[in-house]
């Protein structure tokens, strides 16, 4: 039963967290590169 709606929870989390995390890491990398 849990496996039935697990993808419905997992997909939005991956779809929202992964792009946000990659954007945050890129922003931090750009800031560090700009400062130095």
Curated annotation (Swiss-Prot):
Pfam family, one: PSI_8
SUPFAM superfamilies for the chain: Subunit VIII of photosystem I reaction centre, PsaI
GO biological-process terms attached to the record: photosynthesis
Domain of life of the native organism: Eukaryota
Membrane topology recorded in Swiss-Prot or TrEMBL: Single-pass membrane protein
Keywords: Chloroplast, Membrane, Photosynthesis, Photosystem I, Plastid, Thylakoid, Transmembrane, Transmembrane helix
Transmembrane segments: 8-28
Subcellular localization: Plastid, Chloroplast thylakoid membrane
Transmembrane among keywords: yes
GO CC annotation: chloroplast thylakoid membrane; photosystem I
UniProt keyword Disulfide bond, yes or no: no
Matching HAMAP family: PSI_PsaI (MF_00431)
Similarity comment text for this entry: Belongs to the PsaI family.
Matches recorded under NCBIfam families: PS_I_psaI
Function, in words: May help in the organization of the PsaL subunit.
Stated name of the protein: Photosystem I reaction center subunit VIII
Organism: Phaeodactylum tricornutum (strain CCAP 1055/1)
């Amino acid at each position: 039963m849990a496996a039935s709606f697990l993808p419905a929870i997992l997909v939005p989390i991956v779809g929202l967290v992964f792009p946000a995390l990659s954007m945050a890491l890129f922003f931090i990398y750009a800031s560090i590169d700009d400062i130095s």
